[in-house]
Amino acid sequence: MDTVLHNKPQYLLTKVIEEATEISQAATKSLTFGINNHNPLTPNKSNADDIINEFYHLDAMIEMLQQEGILPKLTKEEELKIKNEKKRKVNNYMKGYGVS
């Protein structure tokens, strides 16, 4: 196998970048073509499906990094705190700019 990545942390972090980029690409396609539209080559899979699938691919890579001890594992409470804080900030931003 030809690769310049010789250790697990490098490889897994590269996969995180790859999956995050694929989420970005799926979201961009949703904005361009519609969230419920699909790639002509995959008519049974919508752009919304692509976003969700790529999110869970990224989640799997984060989980592997946690299992390897490269990233810290969070409790469910810590996860919820981070998520809820982000939601609060985004909702406040949208409200401040009249986004409905």
Segments and roles (model prediction):
Residues 1-100:
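Flexible "arm" and connector segments at domain edges
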